[in-house]
Amino acid sequence: MRLILLGAPGAGKGTQANFIKEKFGIPQISTGDMLRAAVKAGTPLGVEAKTYMDEGKLVPDSLIIGLVKERLKEADCANGYLFDGFPRTIAQADAMKEAGVAIDYVLEIDVPFSEIIERMSGRRTHPASGRTYHVKFNPPKVEGKDDVTGEPLVQRDDDKEETVKKRLDVYEAQTKPLITYYGDWARRGAENGLKAPAYRKISGLGAVEEIRARVFDALK
């Protein structure tokens, strides 16, 4: 099972990624984790990546793809792998295709932006413990107060509506075009000797268990 998980920030990809990893016994491939590990290990690609990171520059896609290919050779990828958060752009998707990275499924978890804004902007956190609440879906017993300590809850900057909207704008511009990219490739079929991935789209609305059932149905 080799798949890419697509969906906007706040669509619930992380939760479903954990279910997929557990069911199929595959690792989640995080480019951030790979970069940090390569830099720490001092591999040639890691050393090269560090020069960009130290200057505050984006690591080039060619370097990221090199790290991905190295990572996929490791033993835990024998049964497959899960990409969440990569590729983010058409250029990265093209680079993966040119590098011959095989993908069986591209799964999109679709949630309307209005729902994502409500989900994320309604979160409230107790900073000391990390306990989280939601003003609508999981409210504290006393408004604005932690259930255990009675201390004030805060809204993290990441959860503020304007921040969420900005992240969704970036997704709309950079990552949403991948939905068309992979849908078109699935219709065209194999290219350059690389099998086209099957494209699946499910609704990310409803209970976590309902969404999990949809995910597993889509991956049959």
From Swiss-Prot:
The keyword Kinase applies. Residues 30-59 are annotated as: NMP. ATP binds at residues 10-15, 123, 132-133, 206. It catalyses: AMP + ATP = 2 ADP. GO terms for cellular component: cytoplasm. PROSITE patterns: ADENYLATE_KINASE. Its EC number is 2.7.4.3. Pathway: Purine metabolism; AMP biosynthesis via salvage pathway; AMP from ADP: step 1/1. Keywords: ATP-binding, Cytoplasm, Kinase, Nucleotide biosynthesis, Nucleotide-binding, Transferase. AMP binds at residues 31, 36, 57-59, 85-88, 92, 156, 167. Disulfide bonds: none annotated. CDD domains: ADK. Signal peptide: none annotated. InterPro entries: Adenyl_kin_sub, Adenylat/UMP-CMP_kin, Adenylat_kinase_CS, Adenylate_kinase_lid-dom, P-loop_NTPase. Monomer. This is Adenylate kinase. It comes from Burkholderia pseudomallei (strain 1710b). The lineage of its organism: Bacteria, Pseudomonadati, Pseudomonadota, Betaproteobacteria, Burkholderiales.
